[in-house]
Amino acid sequence: MRKINLLDLETTNKIAAGEVIERPFSVVKELVENSIDAGAKNITIEIEDGGQKLIKIIDDGEGIYPIDIKNAFLPHATSKINSIEDIYKISTMGFRGEALASISSVSKTKLKSRVDSYNFGKEIYIEGGKIEYLKDTGCNVGTTIEVSDLFYNVPARLKFLKSARSDSSSISDIVNRFILAHPDISFNLINKGKQSIKSYGTGNLKDSIRCVYNKTISENLINFESHKDIISVYGFIGKPEISRKSRTNQSIFVNKRYVKSKFITAAVENAFKSFLTVNSYPFFVIFIDIFPEYIDVNVHPTKSEVKFKDERAMFKTIFDAVHGAIKGELKESFTNFFNKEDINIYDSEKSITEPIKLEKEEVQIPIDLNSNNKIDIFGNNINKLSNNTELLKNIGIKEKNTLENNNDFYTSKQNEIYYANKNDECLNSCNKDNYSKIEKSLQKDNKNPDTLYLNEHNTNSSSINIKENKPNNFYVDMKIIGQFNNTYILIEKDKELYIIDQHAAHEKVLFEKFKSEIENRYVISQILLSPVVIELSEDEFNIYEENKDIFKNSGFSVETFGEYTINIKEVPLILGKPNVENLFMDILYNLKNMKSKETSTIKYNAIATLACKSAVKANDNLKEEEIKKLIEDMLILNNPYTCPHGRPTMIKFTLKDLEKKFKRIQ
């Protein structure tokens, strides 16, 4: 074994510089952070050859006391902390005291600084870590530092530097992050003698965003904020129309420090998930202000990462703030259309003294009387049953809006018959003949054996209690113009034109219904006339085995049929008549691409998304009643604005928008 050597100061400084100073932009970052800590309000950055030849920082901060000028370049010399405990309550950008020592050891560095209480300043020049001179000088209050010939004495590092253009771009990027993090500071970047970036320090974050990006982005932002006991989350997120195919327009600041965090990015993107199309990434500038003792910034040499004490709580806070803001913005955009005050949801007890005359109203019953499923019917007086169904006296009928995906685009409202009086006698007192008559009457309509029709012959009861969703003013000022290409529904309401993608809207309604059924463990399955046998590869079969409970809870009845063969006997009723094999393989492939740690909720959502996509039909010609039903079902959703894949379900044109298009107004 070789002898252990103690490295000299010059060597250790160069090694340390390799960690702290990766490229010229690292020098800019460290020096600008020092200026910010010094309370500067105007910071100028000058660079030449991408910072490889020259980096010059001028600030109007507090400056450095003459007695401290020399000490500032010693390793681990800092004014930010005094003990190890201070590391866990840091409120400054820098704290290690490594930057100046590292930079000066691999470059030629000149620094001039003056504090307000002195009439003159001090100037120091260091070359390769060695002090060449220290003298008095005349200068303004603040600090000016020049770093030239970076890595001149470390040829190995010079070989790995990128082009001047690439380094200039990296410096521009970090300056832009500073502009976003500190709207109250004016930054000026000069590249080769020409002004490249300029901010004005107005203190307005939107002004900073406009300076860094452009007018279009600054006009398509959604503000959000959330304040808890130890944390505040706030900032701006971009509307879906300014999303990008990469994450370059995403900025995270923790206590004003620009950081990169996968879990914070995941929280924002998950909040955005249902509002964006696949492979699109949202624009956002997010600020997290938290007590310093709840984070650790000393986990990376460049301080570009932080750790939180409670990442789960942080994730939820960020998710809720962003998701709520997006939902609120979309809701506000369609306020006139989705005005829930127009839909009067109430319990109406109607006292009817004469027969009700109804035009063949469909009541969808989600059970089959031939099965063992139970239907609970209670009444005070059970009278004779006519050839059709006789409404039982004092029976309560509670309507419940749902969607059933049968051969028609929509079926009528599902009704649930419930207790009108808990003390009433059970219908079991009826004899079996009565049950037989009920069953026959329910099956009279051959088109749908599960549909109960009420007409004027079966409403002789004196009183009916009905709980219903009934449009109040919703349709009064709404005009259904029609369909375009059997795909888009055109609606006029309150002098605004709404265009609804009927398939995206239908898919969203089905998705929410199916997801709700899965969550409530109430997925209705349909038995296939001919079971579908699928041969799987060993890998595919293993994925199925890992997720068979997911399939079961989603309404699939699957049995093993041989070594790597499965037999599908039942599928969710909501699917209608799907291509079972293709759907199953799509779901299996989707689960395969998921990480094993993904929660069952995410897997259920993936299944629901694929299932509903297969259930939506294309190019359907809808009647006015079907359009109204679709709108009613959209109205009760929490988020009717996007389909499960993130595409919008509708767009809106105001009269002003159209007049602008036709050049009637400017």
Swiss-Prot record:
InterPro entries the UniProt entry points to: DNA_mismatch_repair_CS, DNA_mismatch_repair_MutL, DNA_mismatch_S5_2-like, HATPase_C_sf, MutL/Mlh/PMS, MutL/Mlh/Pms-like, MutL_C, MutL_C_dimsub
Residue ranges crossing the lipid bilayer per the database entry: none
Keywords per UniProt: DNA damage, DNA repair
One cellular component (GO) term of this entry: mismatch repair complex
Cystines in this chain: none
GO terms under biological process: mismatch repair
Key word DNA damage present: yes
Molecular function terms from GO: ATP binding; ATP hydrolysis activity; ATP-dependent DNA damage sensor activity; mismatched DNA binding
PANTHER family in alphabetical order: DNA MISMATCH REPAIR PROTEIN MLH, PMS, MUTL, DNA MISMATCH REPAIR PROTEIN MLH1
Family stated for the protein in its record: Belongs to the DNA mismatch repair MutL/HexB family.
Function noted in UniProt: This protein is involved in the repair of mismatches in DNA. It is required for dam-dependent methyl-directed DNA mismatch repair. May act as a 'molecular matchmaker', a protein that promotes the formation of a stable complex between two or more DNA-binding proteins in an ATP-dependent manner without itself being part of a final effector complex.
Protein known as: DNA mismatch repair protein MutL
Record lineage: Bacteria, Bacillati, Bacillota, Clostridia, Eubacteriales
